[in-house]
């Protein structure tokens, strides 16, 4: 790996969780700096044992045309000038299900809740804002999460889903073409006391296709009747 390369964070099952960009190495401290959630991925939580796998410059292609939903086995066969080894199968030897990722719209970036990147608690109206992304334009370099607007891709809209602390869906807003959404106090009242902690999910959509990964943020809500024991009903 070198600075400027990208890599994947892969879980114990061999599934890709997140793409990251390599920003810097520190040999003395044995550390590596990464930019989270590049390309069509978003920042995820990762369990112990997650592996960082670099993406090299060696590529292979087959002539067969395949469709999303098909399953294939993928592997590499190590060879020398005189011999070859056993195939090294991807995904721990499990079949890979094709998803057609290359056609899916990129999720938005630069997520903000009431103007903040990662607030622990908000009060009053909840304003969710984001920056546009465009898979057709993001080809020259790895765009980081906090970058401003790129695009949007033609035909893209956004869907916001809000879940309460029991993970029940309490609101869905579709067809958003701008870069923000406000869940006002009156609308939020429908969630009742369970709305004191909400998870927000935002995806990009185009022609019936949804971004491969959503942007997800969780936050406490303070206000009248909400989180009195923690925030005194306010922030």
Residue ranges and their predicted role:
Residues 66-86, 182-214:
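Beta-strand-rich modules
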Residues 15-20, 163-174, 211-213:
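Surface-exposed loop/edge segments in extracytoplasmic proteins
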Residues 4-6, 19, 125, 155-159, ...:
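Exposed beta-strand and adjacent loop surfaces of beta-rich binding modules
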Residues 58-64, 140-195:
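Recognizes extended acidic, P/S/T-rich segments that occur
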Residues 1-31, 145-146, 203:
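Ser/Thr/Gly-rich low-complexity blocks that favor extended beta-strand/coil architectures
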Residues 26-33, 122-124, 175-181:
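Ser/Thr- and Asn-enriched, surface-exposed coil loops between beta-strands
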């Amino acid at each position: 790996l070198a600075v400027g390369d990208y890599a994947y964070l892969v879980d114990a099952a061999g599934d890709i969780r997140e793409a990251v960009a390599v920003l810097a190495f520190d040999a003395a401290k044995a550390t590596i700096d990464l930019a989270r959630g590049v390309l069509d991925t978003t920042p995820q939580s990762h369990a112990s044992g997650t592996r960082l796998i670099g993406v090299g410059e060696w590529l292979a292609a087959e002539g067969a045309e395949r469709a999303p939903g098909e399953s294939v086995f993928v592997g590499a066969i190590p060879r020398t000038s005189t011999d070859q080894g056993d195939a090294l199968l991807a995904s721990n030897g499990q079949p890979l299900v094709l998803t057609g990722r290359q056609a899916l719209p990129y999720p938005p970036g630069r997520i903000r809740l009431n103007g903040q990147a990662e607030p622990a608690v908000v009060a009053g109206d909840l304003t969710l804002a984001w920056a546009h992304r465009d898979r057709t334009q993001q080809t020259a370099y790895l765009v980081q999460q906090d970058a401003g607007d790129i695009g949007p891709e033609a035909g893209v809209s956004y869907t916001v889903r809000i879940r309460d602390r029991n993970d029940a869906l309490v609101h869905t807003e579709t067809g958003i073409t701008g870069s923000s959404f406000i869940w006002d106090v009156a609308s939020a009242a429908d969630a009742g006391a369970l709305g004191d902690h909400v998870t927000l999910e935002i995806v990009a959509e185009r022609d019936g296709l949804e971004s491969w990964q959503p942007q997800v943020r969780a936050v406490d809500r303070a206000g009248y009747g909400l989180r009195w024991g923690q925030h005194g009903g306010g922030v």
